[in-house]
Regions:
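N-terminal redox-cofactor-binding region of secreted/periplasmic oxidoreductases
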Residues: 2-596
Length: 596
């Protein structure tokens, strides 16, 4: 697809909501009376991609149901620099976790997308494919070489395409063009220069052993520091709605219904003792009417790592003893549903800097912020076209075998191409725990535990499908994860001690600057860590009883029911989860079409 074609596609998306005949704001009579081959629940990365690929076959009629609305081109969604405004907005499910033991018993806000595009419409837009070792571990756990990196390459090639950044600068040396293809999702490197950019890159030449430069972390080997690739095109956010679904808008065999929740999956009968789960129940409110729909071939749950297990448990699919205790009649005894929840822990670490030219100015100066928005509206340039950080680092702890052995643990990463922790650069103050200072200018490293060992769960709050489930990601729930975060903070300190920062860094800020011993660091970490918003694994594929799904993502013990979202991941990728969810959906669609 040429840049001109993408521009035309983007223009179409900007107006399509008002003219699309197959977008319904609720379950109309027309929808309820139609027959669909596949019904997909949830329009995020998994559901949006699967709906698009399945509807490429004109003989397959697809219904895509989204609980949220259709305003996926809202200004706050479209402007990358406004991503933080989307948390606790009308585009967020507004979940909150239970108190996290590993975070000093603090509950935390748990954002999930509630709009066409799902969490791809509210995330920080980092695009990562994952690593060779990540997928090879999936293949081993699932007992299916189809999930290996080598076998997934055809699906990776269908996924992304590199485009020019907003400022059209020369991107030579910022990514490897030979590993990017003509895929559906346009991505780019940062389109607005920051004064810290050369300092970050220079550090990789000054401290190459500890912080090697990585030309392109999407090669399958993430280790090193490199330029962030983001789902941004022409300075606009790219979501599954503006990419995959945009390609499918005019297909007569795809209907999309928004503002509608799937409350449970229904059995239509039995075959060989297994329930045929091709029915769904839908409603728009807790007090409103319910309706039922049936799929001829399959129901696909793509509601995400929180809502997919929630729907399954409400449908009687889960741990039978637990469901009985909650007043739900068990249909399929599948104890692993809702378990294995894991996530990447997030910690903002900030330094005062010798500069008055940082992104802190946008937060404090309303006039400057208005000027930046006006500039973005005119030509897409300026600081509001930036996502979370212009560079990413993926690193392993030194002497990993000895490090984890001393903790009485095995190396939790998938292998040498996969990181233990991540470092994200930000030209300004960052914290999910501390309010931004009213004075001073900052540089921050976000550190993240990228191969966590802690596991949590999703459980029922009640049998009312409009009640949020109980969410426990168990962040920093093991001493291993705390130790890895401690190493990440130490690495961030070592990074800014390089000569490249000697005239820039002034001092560490706040509680960060008061934490020196390991004990002090651990206390600082527990009191300031949050989530990076990557929940996975709650309906994971795997061999035997340990897997809720088989290797082709079918729910065990059922017929006609599949899961296509990050809940299917047996292990979290050592990277951000948007890209791997798209990859999973690409293969899932091929598997489904192969059975049509």
């Amino acid at each position: 697809m040429s840049d001109r074609c993408v521009l035309i596609l983007l223009a179409l998306v900007l107006s399509v909501v008002q003219v699309l005949g197959h977008l319904f704001q609720g379950p109309t009579k027309e929808v309820l009376e139609r027959t669909y081959d596949v019904i997909i629940v949830g329009a995020g990365a998994g559901g949006g991609a699967a709906a698009s690929r399945l509807s490429e076959n004109p003989h397959v009629r697809v219904l895509l149901i989204e609980a949220g609305g259709s305003d996926f081109m809202n200004l706050n969604i479209s402007v990358p620099g406004r991503a933080s405004t989307l948390v606790r907005s009308q585009f967020d499910w507004n979940f909150t976790t239970v108190p996290q033991v590993g975070l000093d018993n603090r509950p935390i806000v748990y954002p999930r997308g509630f709009v066409l595009g799902g969490s791809t419409a509210i995330n920080q837009m980092a695009f990562c494919r994952g690593t060779k070792d990540d997928y090879d571990r999936w293949a081993k756990v699932a007992g299916d070489e189809g999930w290996s990196w080598k076998k997934l390459v055809p699906f990776v090639r269908q996924l992304d395409r590199m485009t020019l950044p907003a400022d059209r600068h020369n991107t030579t040396g910022e990514f490897d063009p030979s590993i990017h293809y003509n895929g559906t999702v346009p991505i780019s490197v940062a389109g607005f220069p920051l004064t810290t950019d050369p300092r970050v890159i220079n550090t990789t030449t000054q401290l190459p052993d500890q912080f090697p430069f990585n030309l392109d972390y999407n090669s399958g080997n993430t280790i090193g520091i490199g330029w962030t690739q983001t789902t941004i095109y022409n300075s606009h956010r790219v979501s599954s709605a503006t990419s995959y679904l945009a390609e499918a808008w005019n297909r007569t065999n795809l209907d999309i219904v928004v503002n509608t929740r799937v409350t449970k999956v229904l059995p239509l009968g039995y075959e060989s003792g297994k329930p045929i789960m091709r029915g769904i129940e839908i409603a728009q409110s807790a007090s409103g009417p319910t309706h039922t729909l049936q799929a001829r071939k399959e129901v696909v749950l793509s509601a995400g790592s929180i809502k997919t297990p929630h729907i399954l448990m409400l449908s009687g699919i889960g741990d039978a003893a637990y469901l009985t205790s909650k007043g739900v009649k068990p249909l399929v005894d599948l104890p692993s549903v809702g378990k294995n929840l894991h996530d990447h822990a997030f910690l903002g670490n900030s330094w005062l800097v010798n500069s008055n030219d940082t992104l802190d100015n946008l937060r404090r100066n309303a006039t400057l912020a208005a000027e930046a928005l006006a500039q973005w509206k005119v030509n897409g340039t300026g600081p509001l076209g930036l996502a979370g950080g212009s560079q990413l680092g993926w690193l392993r702890v030194p002497n990993a075998s000895e490090f984890f052995a001393a903790l009485g643990a095995e190396d939790p990463s998938a292998g040498p191409t996969s990181a233990h922790f991540e470092m994200i650069t930000t030209d300004g103050f960052v914290s999910k725990r501390v309010s931004p200072p009213t004075q001073g200018h900052f540089f921050s490293f976000i550190t993240a535990v990228i191969s966590p060992t802690a596991r949590g769960n999703v459980t029922l709050n009640s049998t009312d499908p409009f009640d949020a489930p109980i969410i426990n990601p168990n962040l920093l729930g093991t001493e291993v994860d705390v130790a890895v975060m401690r190493e990440a903070v130490k690495a961030a300190r070592a990074f800014v001690a390089a000569p490249a920062w000697s005239d820039y860094i002034l001092s560490e800020f706040g509680a960060f600057g008061e934490a020196h011993t390991d004990e002090e660091l651990d206390a600082y970490i527990r009191n300031n860590t949050d989530t990076i918003d990557h929940p996975v694994g709650t309906v994971a594929m795997g061999k035997g009883a340990e897997g809720a799904l088989d290797s082709e993502l079918r729910v065990r013990g059922t017929i006609g029911l599949r899961v296509v979202d990050a809940s299917a991941f047996p292990f979290i990728p050592s990277g951000h989860t948007q890209g791997p969810t798209y990859i999973l959906a690409e293969r899932a669609a091929a598997l489904i079409l192969g059975e049509m």
